[in-house]
Design a protein with these regions (language model features):
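Conserved glycine-rich cofactor-binding loop
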Residues: 6, 13-15
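Residue(s) in the substrate-gating loop at a strand-loop-helix junction
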Residues: 141
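Conserved glycine-rich Rossmann-like NAD(P)H-binding loop of the short-chain dehydrogenase/reductase
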Residues: 27-44
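The beta1-alpha1 cofactor-binding region of Rossmann-like NAD(H)/NADP(H)-dependent oxidoreductases
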Residues: 39, 60-72, 103
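Active-site "substrate specificity/gating" loop of NAD(P)-dependent dehydrogenases
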Residues: 101, 147-151
């Protein structure tokens, strides 16, 4: 179904991102397993994919950093020729009550969850238009609609992804 497709999954070293990466590979895509913090966790995801007969490689990029994202996306396109599927899944939490949350923690969540999604979408949009195909899938959360105590920053970031 996805044979010959190049898929990028951000935040794919564990959790939902790992499950997404494995499913993309199961359907035949070559998966770029993006991670920021844990190379070991990304390697585990890649190993699970390859042991099941799929193809994947782990690539580090902090999606909150626009320059890192630009290098990340440009390197993938340079090496593989295109990106067919982008799944924006990278996300962090810095939970605290609104009156106690620091601006640094608020910004960290917005920068990763919302701006990281923007960075990667902006960078793949033009190449996808040129190739006249491509899919962008943004993972959000019900918290972006209903909120959650202690997660004002997370709720704002996920509401932004929903649009």
């Amino acid at each position: 179904m996805l044979e010959e497709k190049i898929a990028v999954a951000t935040g794919a070293s564990r959790g939902i991102g790992r499950a997404i990466a494995k499913e993309l590979a199961l359907k035949g895509a070559f998966v770029i397993v993006n991670y920021n913090g844990s190379k070991q966790a990304a390697d585990e995801t890649v190993n699970e994919i390859t042991q099941a007969g799929g193809k994947a490689v782990g690539v580090q990029c902090n999606v909150a950093d626009a320059a890192e994202c630009e290098a990340f996306i440009n390197n993938i396109i340079s090496e593989y020729g295109r990106i067919d599927i982008l799944v924006n899944n990278a996300g962090i939490v810095r939970d605290n009550l609104l009156m106690r949350i620091s601006e640094k923690d608020f910004d960290a969540v917005i920068d990763t969850n919302l701006k990281g999604t923007f960075h990667t979408m902006r960078l793949v949009a033009r190449p996808m238009l040129r190739q006249r195909s491509g899919r962008i899938i943004n993972i959000s959360s019900v918290v972006g609609i209903f909120g959650n105590a202690g997660q004002a920053n997370y709720a704002a970031s996920k509401a932004g992804v929903i649009g």
